[in-house]
From Swiss-Prot:
Catalyzes the irreversible transfer of a propylamine group from the amino donor S-adenosylmethioninamine (decarboxy-AdoMet) to putrescine (1,4-diaminobutane) to yield spermidine. This is Polyamine aminopropyltransferase 1. It catalyses: S-adenosyl 3-(methylsulfanyl)propylamine + putrescine = S-methyl-5'-thioadenosine + spermidine + H(+). GO terms for molecular function: spermidine synthase activity.
């Protein structure tokens, strides 16, 4: 008998993957966690029925969350990742030698635990000496921080359950306070096909707080619609005005210095969402 997993991305549309076996399933304090081995995409982390990451395509999301802001900032030393318990963004952050400390604040410790066990190629960097892992509420951590970070990355689930507070104007204002005077922040902001209103709302809220606010995209096969957006807010440095000499060689599979600028070239229907 064949076993298949289906994520209903809307009431009328979804994606399906053939499952070889279930590695772990658990109702944590915060969400339903499933780790499965798929035929096509390797091991897959699923939270509340939504695909969070897979071994095959994870690099796209993690590279684009990390490298766009880190190459935009001239000297990122202290970095905060809110969410991201799978460790993929942290792995990419550590590719930048200027980073002296990377802090991860993940609300669900079980995500960290089982990512280390079943997604070692993604989560392996969490044990690096430059990394501090905190199991706790990222919203509260931001509220308690001031003038501390060069770059803040919000690697959250969609705005449901424990992540709902991470999509509020108050949270973005807190991020601005937690950043240094030339700090940069980035957040994943879902897809333009199924959640256009979210993109419009987040962009508007961020733009009212950060003088430089831009939207960029990446193609991620297992995420709803495949076209994903990210909103970047910066106090001083424009991601479209990065000097050539700032780019240094790092090992990537998706991000390149050419793609850095190209990612900000939006399809018209996406650009219309933020006018």
């Amino acid at each position: 008998m064949e076993l298949w997993f289906t994520e209903k991305q809307t009431k009328h549309f979804g994606i399906t993957a053939r499952i070889n076996r279930t590695l772990h399933t658990e109702q944590t304090e915060f969400q339903k966690l499933d780790m499965v081995e798929t035929e096509e995409f390797g091991n897959m982390l699923i939270l509340d029925g939504m695909v969070m990451t897979t071994e095959k395509d994870e690099f796209v999301y993690h590279e684009m969350v990390a490298h766009v802001p880190l190459f935009t900032h001239p000297n990122p030393e202290n970095v905060l990742v809110v969410g991201g318990g799978d460790g993929g963004v942290i792995r990419e952050v550590l590719k930048h030698p200027s980073v002296k400390k990377a802090t991860l604040v993940e609300i669900d410790g079980k995500v960290i635990e089982y990512s280390k066990q079943y997604l070692p190629s993604i989560a392996g960097a969490l044990d690096n000496e430059r990394v501090e892992v905190k199991v706790g509420d990222g919203f509260l951590h931001i509220a308690e921080s001031e003038n501390e970070y060069d770059v803040i990355m919000v690697d959250s689930t969609e705005p449901v359950g424990p992540a709902v507070n991470l999509f509020t104007k108050g949270f973005y204002a807190g991020i601005s306070k937690a950043l240094k005077e030339d700090g940069i922040f980035v957040a994943q902001t879902d897809n333009p096909w199924f959640t256009p209103e979210l993109i419009t709302t987040v962009f508007k809220d961020v733009k009212e707080i950060f003088p430089i606010t831009r939207l960029y995209t990446a193609n991620i096969p297992t995420y709803p619609s495949g076209l994903w957006t990210f909103t970047i807010g910066s106090k001083k440095h424009d991601p479209l005005e990065v000097s050539e000499e700032r780019f240094h060689e790092i090992e990537t599979k998706y991000y390149t210095k050419e793609l850095h600028n190209a990612a900000f070239a939006l399809p018209k229907f996406v650009g219309d969402l933020i006018k």
